[in-house]
Design a protein with these regions (language model features):
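Conserved N-terminal/central alpha/beta ligand/cofactor-binding core
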Residues: 70-183, 187-189, 201, 302, ...
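Beta1/beta-strand and adjacent pyrophosphate-binding region of the FAD-binding site
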Residues: 36-48
């Protein structure tokens, strides 16, 4: 059995140190059926970026493959993601005049995770993701020119597709899947993974439930690929590890509920790093849209309701999460000038214009006017902006923002700000895997065949 989860280790703080076998109770294993309703060589669970990639590669290698999606549309979290992709691609970083390499990416990712991640997995990710960029181009993805440091990314190595969002990856992969004859079946929910015996033997296939409640057993002659994503859309599971997250919104699509992980545990797979739950600023409580002017973080600062900065905006996402959750009403405001707005709009134009139209993002010709619109003390906000602009000159920030991110003053009108709040974004743990994406069996550390 193989596991190919795009979200595992992304961001660098996933842990491979501790197993959490009691997580939400592992599902009981399915009984082996006497007959099978259908058979494929490879069955892929989930139609996000990982699932479609796995299905396409399997199909191109000659396997009779199928991708199963429990929701009514394909795409998973990739479909609703911002689309930013970190990779140390030599042509890109040399053109930008930036020092980078897959080895530096690996080193920074390990450090960003407090060295708790599995070094072999981190190296596998960082060394192979440049090839993933080229593979995406092969299947039809077009990227915008240039790279930048995305919020929480810690280094300028991110790029976005031309269409700005992760939906471009899904569109390209679906078109390619159709061309090569790979079936992607929606409203096909996997409700169990079948092994020869609960504690021994190979993985045989899956139990599938249809929209009308009917169930079938589908055999996998060669492999089952679990690419079903995490559990950030399941507040109960998240609160098991961090009660602060229970009432937060989520950036995830509703299918990210974690049941496939329980099925993996039910047949002997280990679960690791489940308490690493990443949050990002997104839609504030009581609002319908997001003021997304913080992706190009070198142009943006965060203010609390008192009008003061409270964190280094280029810090790790867990640092920003904890600092933001400690602020008044857990609501803060990204602030930028027109240069910052234009830069962020290279990636999130449509989203920001919707936010402007719907009163979630505010625009003013002076900082004082902007402060009144977002209801923070004008004199404090003006002083904060002036202090920050002075830091750009001195390259020193008491909160610890790095000099490379102290590069753009907030001086050019009009100015922009809007409320944001923390949302559950990325459950960084999952099933324990090796560098071949195989799942070891609990206690023995043999791999599931």
């Amino acid at each position: 059995m193989t596991l190919n989860r795009r979200s595992f280790l992304v961001g660098g703080a996933a842990s491979a140190a501790a197993s959490v076998s009691t997580f939400a109770h592992a599902a009981n294993p399915c009984s082996t059926p006497t007959t099978w309703d259908k058979a494929y060589d490879v069955i892929v669970i989930g139609s996000g970026g990982a699932g479609l990639s796995a299905g396409i590669v399997a199909k191109e290698k000659g396997a009779n493959a199928v991708v199963l999606e429990k929701l009514s549309i394909p795409g998973g979290n990739t479909m609703v993601s911002g689309g930013g992709l970190n990779a140390a691609v030599e042509a890109d970083y040399k053109k930008a005049g930036i020092e980078d390499s897959p080895q530096l990416h690996t080193k920074q990712t390990m450090a960003a995770g407090d060295f708790r991640a599995d070094p072999a997995l981190v190296a596998t990710l960082c060394e192979n993701v440049p090839q993933s960029v080229e593979w995406l181009k092969k299947v039809g993805v077009q990227f915008k020119p240039g790279i930048y440091q995305i919020y929480g990314g810690l280094w300028p190595r991110c790029r976005n597709p031309v269409g700005q969002s992760g939906g471009d990856y899904i569109k390209a992969c679906m078109n390619y899947a159709n061309r090569i004859g790979l079936p992607v079946l929606t409203n096909h929910k996997v409700v169990g993974i079948i092994r020869e015996k609960p504690d021994s033997g190979r993985v045989l296939g899956v139990e599938v439930e249809f929209k009308d409640g009917k169930k079938e057993f589908w055999k996998a002659n060669k492999a089952v690929v679990a690419a079903a994503g995490g559990f950030a859309a399941n507040p109960t599971m998240c609160s098991y590890f961090d009660p602060r997250l229970t009432k937060l919104n989520t950036t995830n699509q509703p299918g990210s509920t974690g049941e496939v992980l329980k099925y993996i545990q039910g047949i002997g797979g280990l679960a690791v790093g489940l308490d690493y739950i990443q949050c990002i600023p997104w839609t504030a409580p009581g609002y319908k849209h997001t003021a997304d002017i913080f992706q190009a973080i070198e142009y943006t600062i965060f203010l609390n309701k008192e009008g003061k900065r409270y964190v280094a905006e280029d810090a790790r996402r867990d640092v920003i999460r904890d600092a933001t959750l400690a602020q008044t009403d857990q609501t803060v405001f990204p602030v930028c000038d027109t240069d910052g707005f234009d830069k962020n709009n290279e990636y999130y134009n449509e989203m920001n214009h919707r936010a402007l139209e719907n009163g979630t993002l505010f625009k003013a010709d002076t900082i004082e006017e902007l402060a009144k619109l977002i209801k923070v003390p004008p004199e404090v906000m003006v002083a904060t902006i002036n202090e920050y602009n002075a830091m750009v000159d001195s390259k020193k920030d008491p909160l610890g923002r790095t000099p490379i991110m102290l590069s753009h003053k907030i001086v050019k009108a009009p100015f922009y700000a809007g409320p944001i709040g923390m949302c559950r974004h990325h459950t960084m743990g999952g099933a324990k895997i090796n560098t071949k994406a195989q799942v070891p069996v609990s206690y023995t550390h043999l791999t599931l065949p």
